[in-house]
Regions:
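Oxidoreductase cofactor-interface core, primarily capturing Rossmann-like NAD(P)-dependent enzymes
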Residues: 2-47, 61-64, 69-73, 80-91, ...
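Short, conserved active-site loop motifs that form the nucleotide-linked donor/cofactor pocket
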Residues: 52-53, 143
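A hydrophobic C-terminal alpha-helical subdomain
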Residues: 2, 202, 226-227, 234-286
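Acidic/proline-rich low-complexity IDRs
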Residues: 35, 47-50, 271, 281
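Cofactor-binding loops of NAD(P)H-dependent oxidoreductases
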Residues: 58
Length: 286
């Protein structure tokens, strides 16, 4: 199948984890990248500029900034950064990007979504992304939706506080034996770049992505096997943990306990044969 590179892709959320990986993979494959940031002169913006990206101002609450950032691009990687105060705020931000993409008549939008599927769950961040994807389809955008469930970085990234979150509170609420589909942020970036390179293959697709499906108990066993010790845990009372995280995270974990989610890893490996399972991810993170 024909592969297309060499155009310009605008990346929303470029200084975050997901957007940052998308930027890196696109640059590595020969794309020109316009990286959107609310603080383009900041440290993270300077880092992306050093990699070769054109870092520009872009704010999902500022339609004019999106029109400027999207002008002349062939593709857009769209997502809503975390932290919206309400589902309405997140949907508004996502649709601001969608309408700007429509005004720019871009050839391909790759949307970073999340969650289990097509039905709303009561988990705000999942439901907001579902509504945005529907809105993008209503606008008839040439769309690919990437829908991971949980990122492997939750196990090791200190900014996620895995000692108190992934290895302590999450198993208490979601269930230690509940099987969860996992994908690394690195592999999400690689899959996004692949989608832009092969638009005729991916436009119109809603891709549920998983490179591994394991319970937290199984992940704990793999962690011990790879690193020679159990993952660190810091027991924190739930009332105290809630001071550090959005209640929507707790809603998500409780939803997982009551709603089994399985996934077929085959389609992900068809797109990216080098995708890492939990063991390979933890080995690389050692």
């Amino acid at each position: 199948m024909a592969s297309t590179t060499g155009g310009t892709v605008a990346v929303v959320g470029a200084t975050g984890r997901q957007g940052g990986q998308v930027v890196r993979h696109l640059l590595a494959e020969g794309w020109r990248v316009r990286a959107l940031s609310r603080t383009p002169a900041g440290k993270k913006g300077a880092e992306l500029n050093g990699l070769g990206a054109d870092v520009v101002y872009g704010d999902l609450e500022d339609a004019a900034s999106l029109d400027s950032a999207f002008a002349g691009v062939s593709g857009i990687f769209a997502m809503q950064p975390p932290g919206a105060a309400s589902i309405e705020d997140e949907v508004r931000q996502g649709m601001n990007a969608a309408r700007a993409a429509a005004r720019a008549s871009v050839a391909h939008v790759v949307y970073g979504s999340a969650g289990p599927g097509d039905a709303e769950t009561g988990v705000r961040q999942w439901d907001a992304k579902l509504r945005v994807a529907r809105g993008m389809n209503d606008l008839r955008l040439p769309l690919t939706v990437l829908r991971p469930m949980a990122f492997m970085e939750l196990m090791v990234d200190p900014t996620f506080y895995p000692q108190s979150s992934t290895w302590y509170t999450m198993p208490r609420l979601a269930g230690v034996d509940r099987r969860i589909p996992w994908l690394s942020v690195h592999d999400l970036g690689a899959i996004a770049a692949r989608a832009f390179a092969e638009p005729e293959r991916f436009i119109g697709k809603d891709l549920r992505l998983a490179a591994d499906v394991k319970s937290l108990a199984e992940c704990r066993q793999v962690f011990r096997s790879v690193k020679g010790k159990n993952p660190p845990r810091f027991p924190m009372p739930l009332f105290l943990f809630r001071r550090f995280v959005d209640d929507d995270i707790l809603t998500m974990w409780r939803w997982l306990r009551e709603n089994p989610v399985d996934a077929d890893t085959g389609p992900t490996y068809e797109i990216l044969p080098t995708a890492k399972d939990v063991r390979a991810f933890l080995q690389a993170a050692s």
